[in-house]
From Swiss-Prot:
Protein name: Purine-cytosine permease fcyB
A Pfam family reported for this protein in Swiss-Prot or TrEMBL: Transp_cyt_pur
UniProt xrefs under PANTHER family: PURINE-CYTOSINE PERMEASE FCY2-RELATED
Function in brief: This permease has a broad specificity towards purines, and also transports cytosine, but neither uracil nor thymine. Contributes very little in purine uptake. Its major role may be the uptake of cytosine.
Residue ranges annotated as Extracellular topological domain: 94-104, 169-177, 222-243, 300-323, 396-404, 464-477
GO cellular component: plasma membrane
Organism of this sequence: Emericella nidulans (strain FGSC A4 / ATCC 38163 / CBS 112.46 / NRRL 194 / M139)
The encoding gene: fcyB
Major subcellular site: membrane
Cytoplasmic-side positions: 1-72, 126-147, 199-200, 265-278, 345-374, 426-442, 499-508
Top-level taxon in the UniProt lineage: Eukaryota
A molecular function (GO) term: transmembrane transporter activity
One annotated GO biological process: purine nucleobase transport
Length: 508
């Protein structure tokens, strides 16, 4: 394999005699961040001395797109999903939706295949040199993108909190004297140390971190298979089964598609001439392998709780996912505890994209926010995530289920509008005038996107199924959640109808 990290990203000298870039493509060379005597420049010079990535949402020049390894793309998502959070999604099949083994496995398979497609698709836009939310301006316009940025910030923070709770459960299962808030702090601070440094360190960490986690999951698989405690819970029948499959599928889809809104953030240093097919395939492999393996493992292990009073049942009731896995590893003694610690720390790989991208997304909100260096926003986002995770620790299942559905809803609408615009109105990658990304007068007005979003929300409401509300179409689907499917369909159809009028009246 070619050297994956033989490139040098943004390690700029502390003082560079240069002027701002005046090229027509809007790209900003890295050395310009340290030019001048402003507070911003001084902070950036300090960052350069510490080898911290200085670039925020500024477009990456072609000369700095030196990440030539395709494996860096796949390993990013391989590590981010080869984690205990994926295991927790599989557990929901029985714990929340009361599915049997085979139907839960099939749901995991098909909804993951559907959910990852948009992540693979949007990863292909990174070589344009723009972060995902910045590139979104070319679909939604200057102001509408800010609304999606707010949703993306909520998604990043929510993901970070939910994942930290899973890791905290693992640490609590190892040592019950470790309170939930302390475990959340440990995991969040470890993640901050990686993401604070920036793109190169994030990719370097993700490149290797999946290996020990994969080994631990193989140990869990082997130990559980040897125990003979697997229970082949039969499939359900009738309309209630359909409702459970659709609702669990929505949660699985939400987890798989959750990276959609910042997929391009992790391919911006790929060369501009990188094959879109290679990016798509590398992303697909990096996602589908860990998602299917770990979620299906979670489905299988959770079947053992069907025996009431068993160590699995007691462990899950006491310490959630951590207690369940601890029950599997119990025969291994102290080595089993070591494996639990490895799994707890796997959350760092899971949360790196969230901590890194939340900072970039905040910068999209205003010029003032962009003037605050990325790494400072990363620090701020970490604090907010901790504040969300600690009170949510004791209500994890409810938090996770509701959050997965929220992710599925809004990302389905976002994807529908962007995909329709790409294939119908831009007619492929050649139809973009990327240089207009920061020229609001040349971007779409956003009226069509706004109305389409409203229609998407209407579709979502009619199809959603939550404890506090069940939409009329969901009721006809046996209470199954079809919110993301209807949100996508309503948004796509309405955008196709409205966008031609927007182009006709505004010319953009």
């Amino acid at each position: 394999m070619a050297g994956a990290f033989d490139f040098d990203l943004e390690k700029n000298p502390p003082v560079v005699q240069s002027t701002a870039d005046n090229s027509s493509d809007g790209a900003v060379p890295g050395e310009t961040f340290t030019y001048g005597d402003s507070t911003y420049a001084k902070i950036q010079r300090l960052a350069a001395e510490l080898n911290i990535e200085q670039r925020g949402i500024e477009r990456v020049p072609a000369a700095e797109q030196t990440d030539t390894s395709v494996f860096n793309i796949g390993s990013m998502w391989l590590a981010a999903n080869m984690v205990v959070s994926s295991f927790a999604i599989g557990v929901l099949g029985k714990s929340v939706y009361s599915l049997g083994f085979v139907d839960a496995i099939l749901t995991v398979l098909f909804f993951n295949l559907l959910g990852i497609m948009t992540v693979c698709f949007f990863s292909c836009f990174g070589p344009f040199g723009l972060r995902q939310m910045v590139f979104s301006r070319l679909w939604f316009g200057w102001y509408v993108t800010k609304g999606f940025a707010v949703l993306n910030i909520l998604a990043c923070l929510g993901w970070s909190a939910a994942n930290a709770i899973v890791g905290a459960q693992m640490l609590h299962a190892v040592n019950s004297d470790v309170p939930g808030f302390a475990a959340i702090l440990i995991i969040s601070i470890c993640t901050l140390l990686v993401t604070f440094a920036g793109y190169k360190v994030v990719h370097l960490y993700e490149y290797w971190s999946w290996i020990p986690t994969f080994i631990v999951f193989m140990i869990i698989l082997g130990t559980f298979a040897h125990s003979g405690d697997f229970q082949n819970i039969p499939m359900g029948v009738g309309t209630s089964e359909m409702g459970s499959v659709l609702s669990f599928g929505s949660a699985v889809y939400g987890f798989a598609t959750g990276w959609t809104s910042y997929a391009a953030d992790y391919t911006v240093y790929q060369p501009a001439n990188r094959s879109k097919r290679k990016i798509f395939l590398s992303t697909w492999l990096g996602l589908i392998v860990p998602l299917l393996f770990v979620e299906m493992l979670g489905v299988a292990v959770m079947t053992a709780t069907d025996i009431k009073g068993s160590k699995y049942d007691v462990g899950y009731a006491t310490s959630g996912n951590g207690g369940l896995i601890a029950a599997v590893l119990q025969p291994l003694g102290g080595f089993g505890d070591f494996c639990l610690v490895i799994l707890a720390l796997s959350i760092v790989a899971n949360n790196c994209p969230n901590f890194y991208s939340v900072a970039l997304t905040v910068q999209v909100l205003s010029r003032y926010a962009q003037r605050v260096p990325r790494f400072i926003w990363t620090l701020f986002g970490t604090g907010v995530s901790i504040a969300i995770a600690i009170p949510g620790y004791s209500h994890f299942e409810t938090v996770l289920e509701n959050f997965m559905n929220f992710i599925a809803y809004w990302l389905a609408i976002y994807s529908a509008i962007a995909i329709m615009d790409h294939f119908v109105f831009k007619r492929g990658f050649s139809g973009y005038v990327v240089e207009n990304f920061d020229k609001r007068e040349k971007l779409p007005v956003g009226i069509a996107a706004t109305i389409a979003f409203g229609f998407g929300v209407a579709g979502m409401i009619t199809g959603m199924s939550q404890p506090w509300y069940v939409g009329p179409i969901a009721r006809h689907a046996a209470g199954g959640d079809v919110g993301f499917e209807l949100g996508f369909a309503f948004a796509a159809f309405s955008y196709l109808c409205l966008r031609p009028f927007e182009i006709k009246f505004f010319g953009r």
